[in-house]
């Protein structure tokens, strides 16, 4: 059984027991998170919401609160010798999907 959920402005296809890296969520490691914005549930029978599946929830547990890989942003002006190098690490949360209920 799988589901499509919406969190952090993005949509993710999830299944029970798998890990998912999403934008930072509020909570400590070990806390339980419930997603009510379930867009679709698949398995033997596919249920598509309009826009959400009524009564469906996905429960997950926070496994890791951390940062993503560093990306480098380099800006320069041609012929001027002006250069700027910045680094950025986005905050991420790793979830373990516990249960999909419809």
Curated annotation (Swiss-Prot):
Domain of life: Bacteria
Zinc found in the keyword field: no
Record's function text: This protein binds to 23S rRNA in the presence of protein L20.
UniProt xrefs under InterPro entries: bL21-like (IPR028909), bL21-like_sf (IPR036164), Ribosomal_bL21 (IPR001787), Ribosomal_bL21_CS (IPR018258)
Subunit structure: Part of the 50S ribosomal subunit. Contacts protein L20.
UniProt name for this protein: Large ribosomal subunit protein bL21
PANTHER family with a match to the protein in the record: 50S RIBOSOMAL PROTEIN L21, LARGE RIBOSOMAL SUBUNIT PROTEIN BL21M
Cellular component terms per the entry's GO annotation: cytoplasm; ribonucleoprotein complex; ribosome
NCBIfam families, alphabetized: L21
Organism lineage: Bacteria, Pseudomonadati, Thermodesulfobacteriota, Desulfuromonadia, Desulfuromonadales
Keywords of this entry: Ribonucleoprotein, Ribosomal protein, RNA-binding, rRNA-binding
């Amino acid at each position: 059984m799988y589901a499509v959920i919406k969190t952090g402005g993005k949509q993710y296809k999830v299944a029970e027991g798998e890990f998912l890296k999403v934008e930072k969520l509020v909570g400590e490691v070990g806390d339980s998170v419930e997603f009510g914005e379930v867009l679709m549930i698949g398995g033997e029978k596919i249920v598509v919401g309009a826009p959400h599946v009524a009564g469906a929830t996905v429960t997950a547990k926070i496994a890791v609160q951390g940062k993503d890989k560093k990306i480098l942003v380099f800006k320069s002006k041609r012929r001027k010798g002006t250069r700027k190098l910045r680094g950025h690490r986005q905050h991420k949360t790793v979830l373990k999907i516990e249960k999909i209920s419809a």
